[in-house]
Amino acid sequence: MAGKFVQYGRHRKRRNYARISEVLELPNLIEIQTKSYDWFLKEGLLEMFRDISPIEDFTGNLSLEFVDYRLGEPKYDLEESKNRDATYAAPLRVKVRLINKETGEVKDQEVFMGDFPLMTDTGTFVINGAERVIVSQLVRSPSVYFNEKIDKNGRENYDATVIPNRGAWLEFETDAKDIVYVRIDRTRKLPLTVLLRALGYSTDQSIIDLLGDNEYLRNTLEKDSTENTEQALLEIYERLRPGEPPTVENAKSLLYSRFFDPKRYDLASVGRYKMNKKLHLKHRLFNQKLAEPIVNSDTGEIVAEEGTVLDRRKLDEIMDVLESNANIEVDELDDSIVNEPVEIQSIKVYVPNDEEGRTTTVIGNAFPDSEVKCITPADIVASMSYFFNLLHGIGQTDDIDHLGNRRLRSVGELLQNQFRIGLSRMERVVRERMSIQDTDSITPQQLINIRPVIASIKEFFGSSQLSQFMDQANPLAELTHKRRLSALGPGGLTRERAQMEVRDVHYSHYGRMCPIETPEGPNIGLINSLSSYARVNEFGFIETPYRKVDLETNTVTDQIDYLTADEEDSYVVAQANSRLDDEGHFISEEVVCRFRGNNTMMDRDKMDYMDVSPKQVVSAATACIPFLENDDSNRALMGANMQRQAVPLMNPESPFVGTGMEHATARDSGAAVINKHFGRVEHVESNEIKVRRIIEEDGQQYDGELDTYRLAKFKRSNSGTCYNQRPIVKDGDIVSQGEILADGPSMELGEMALGRNVVVGFMTWDGYNYEDAVIMSERLVKDDVYTSIHIEEYESEARDTKLGPEEITRDIPNVAESALKNLDERGIVYVGAEVKDGDILVGKVTPKGVTELTAEERLLHAIFGEKAREVRDTSLRVPHGAGGIVLDVKVFNREDGDDSLSPGVNQLVRVYIVQKRKIHVGDKMCGRHGNKGVISKIVPEEDMPYLPDGTPIDIMLNPLGVPSRMNIGQVLELHLGMAAKNLGIHVASPVFDGANDDDVWSTIEEAGMARDGKTVLYDGRTGEPFDNRISVGVMYMLKLAHMVDDKLHARSTGPYSLVTQQPLGGKAQFGGQRFGEMEVWALEAYGAAYTLQEILTYKSDDTVGRVKTYEAIVKGENISKPSVPESFRVLMKELQSLGLDVKVMDEDDKEIEMADVDEDDVNEHKVNIQQSSIPESQKETTD
């Protein structure tokens, strides 16, 4: 028997077919969100306040400092926030110090800086009552990048770009005449030497001494018309500020503010790290021949002679000397912008492959401290030097799609950037107020205006492209959404501009980003998912874990190192499935491994690292597909994406054939209830679980506090499905920390359960499964196998209008008593009432405009008092196609002191309607291998084909859907699933390390089935056996969110577009069916003239005709002839607006009068057509 039993959680054992032992536990799958937010609260906020303080006034007398901050208690807890449509947030209070330097007076005060949204334990935010997720953004890391490009003559040219976190870009490029230019902040280009002169290298000779003599530099100096620092500064000023009179002082301050002012230019710590790494000498000296000796300046010892070729070993030897102080030059510059000497490190080497033996200078930036967040003149000089080195064939260009050059901005950093914007706006206000107000009586509270800060945070959570409404279709969708990486958004790419290369899978994605899970369509490759073991380091680069190989003994150790993409480039990594002996030596002489982008075989003693797990390549959702290794990648992509669209079923069931990931994904998704402390279950109810903590001290156990966990019961999720939690522990159970106490939606016994295990046969049946259609047994409808619960929310507000307040009431004009049967005395529907489309949920009347009364009416009014109120019915009704049972009603009143209502709203009523949807013809189903189809027929159980023991099968799939799509995984799942069912076990087949063919066949034989997995089937209608044996087995099938009930739509009359008077389109607008150009041709081809006429007139935009037609149908008369369609009039008006005189003639060349339709003409025949089901915002005009 292959495989061994493994326990997943408390309740589930699976036979696991993995051969590779797990060295590393899966990390917490949502830590990318929670860790980043914790960093923001602990360090990010402090960093912000440090950056901005002190704020000084223009005279430098007053100074405002931010000392410390604290977060208070949230106003509402999580549940309350969701119910009240409030934001789950805590007040941020900042301790501020105002110092008056003249008088020496110091004032401390705590200032409220607005409510700050808090992250929930599950990595989401509750904003205005809705759960939202902040998606991490993939952006280019700030650094210096070198590119190679081929010009139109086929010559190699280079360009370089210095990209900061914020601030001006600096670009170098060459042209056809071998002149090197620089661009500052995307302006017109200048010769590169102009910038060098401006930095203080004023003479030609000092520039040549600095960069080394070469033809590119000579050409550039010839092109350069400036001769000293002053001229260079004026030249730059004229380029950056054309039209302004240049002065040397202005030019200096401009250049300083562009690059050397920490408030305007910021590399961030990651930029400094990347910059120092790129401009380090070691990468350029590798394999180069020295043209001067390298001397240890402390001892005077020569560590490398002139003429030495620096291979890896020699470089490692001299590394310490290089990094301490070798060859560091300190240039004291005259008239420099930055008043510090420029420290650089320079070494001369011979130009490679040069017969004349010319030399070039390699300059490094002498590694500035990591605290230096600005660019330094040394950085600029070293970047220029790297550029000249590239022109001589020294150094490497950068690949922008490499994950060493792309980093993640997670929640914390995105929030910090947004907060910084708010604080800098606030800073301006503070400065202005400092200069206006009286310095003696002023307090910090009076200076600070928190509006810009609150506004920028609100704007980020409410409308940023990266703050998204959480996809809550099922727990897997929720988990994947939190682990999503997007290259779009502010500061990122746009769909239209993104090239093929950005979207492509790159070798550096291995173990960091999933190569499979990405959307189909315009976002392909721009939105990705984090791999299962990946984590994000302090600089925002994605790291993946590897097992270290001990180089002395050549054994694979259990030491785990996390490597970023550019660190990994220096090592050879063996695959996770390389075979090892008991000591951890590689068994084969040659091992399959990866080095940079190449997959090769190498000697086993060359290995540096080994993968920790075969599933480290793929994301959490992809790792849930069994037999992934037997599926084509395109279908696997669909499989991974469609699992996220599975609807939570009423009776979920975890798969017989899983991958062992079901428990981890369910636990970390946020849908389950997780135990926080080791303890004993004391009390279990359907809506709460109580756990008594157990504290261990000196080997003794004591009872601690009692924790209460509330369960969500039949709540509405973001996607309108039912969110319900069920306990899976019982009284007296001892539960460990992190254990699942209650299942969420789409979970069973602590495992993800998106669908059901059903018996499937691959066979055709009267052509009903043509084109991937699915034939289903009626048993699945009868036994509620694929029944799901859906909850819709409807709300009605009573507002104050100009004519008086709206009122929620049972007293509605012109409505029959029968229509009010479900309303209580307040005019609100009862809980438990069954409603269908058009029924009133909340009775509401709105005051109409009061008309001027006649003298008689005024007299009657004076005698009899109140005249009958003029109100119109604006009740909330059930929209078309909806309906169900009223699950809950929530009423919020302003009188009850409900301050969460928006201004102008007196009362808010929310009604929740629940529907139990059985599966229908037209619903979409799928497996986990991208095999999707629509149900075409539901066959009575007795007519379904049956197995030899009389069991009817549940679903028939078309066998033609398998070969061309190459997703063979579904066939293996089918056979193994049948064996698991017969043996009464659950199995796990992990991706890339699962059951192989022999395992599947041996398990089939163990279950007493035929070795080929096929069986004789009998036709349920005739009882005859089918000609050939058929593959029958158990497959895990999901019901997808694309349900026919949501798509079916019909219209009789409804809203019309204002200009063309044609019906609107789409279900949401209650629109009509488009009869387009080609459909017109079809009717013309049939000669169906009258049918075509009524489609183009009454049923479309003949405004008068359609009203008369309606009237005629109601009265039972004949329908009159149509008049002119409105769109024809629109065309005429368009032509007339161009100044053309347009007339319409009949066949006798007589002019036809085109009278404008008068409102009264239409109103005369007006028929009141009920259109309550159209939302106010979508009503344009109605007949």
Curated annotation (Swiss-Prot):
It is an enzyme of class 2 (transferase). Keywords: DNA-directed RNA polymerase, Nucleotidyltransferase, Transcription, Transferase. GO terms for biological process: DNA-templated transcription. Its EC number is 2.7.7.6. Pfam families: RNA_pol_Rpb2_1 (PF04563), RNA_pol_Rpb2_2 (PF04561), RNA_pol_Rpb2_3 (PF04565), RNA_pol_Rpb2_45 (PF10385), RNA_pol_Rpb2_6 (PF00562), RNA_pol_Rpb2_7 (PF04560). PROSITE patterns: RNA_POL_BETA. It comes from the Bacteria. Residues 1155-1183 are annotated as: Disordered. It catalyses: RNA(n) + a ribonucleoside 5'-triphosphate = RNA(n+1) + diphosphate. GO terms for cellular component: DNA-directed RNA polymerase complex. InterPro entries: DNA-dir_RNA_pol_bsu_external_1 (IPR019462), DNA-dir_RNA_pol_su2 (IPR015712), DNA-dir_RNAP_su2_dom (IPR007120), DNA-dir_RNAP_su2_hyb_sf (IPR037033), RNA_pol_bsu_bac (IPR010243), RNA_pol_bsu_CS (IPR007121), RNA_pol_bsu_protrusion (IPR007644), RNA_pol_Rpb2_2 (IPR007642). GO terms for molecular function: DNA binding; DNA-directed RNA polymerase activity; ribonucleoside binding. NCBIfam families: PRK00405.1, rpoB. DNA-dependent RNA polymerase catalyzes the transcription of DNA into RNA using the four ribonucleoside triphosphates as substrates. HAMAP family: RNApol_bact_RpoB. The RNAP catalytic core consists of 2 alpha, 1 beta, 1 beta' and 1 omega subunit. When a sigma factor is associated with the core the holoenzyme is formed, which can initiate transcription. Belongs to the RNA polymerase beta chain family. This is DNA-directed RNA polymerase subunit beta.
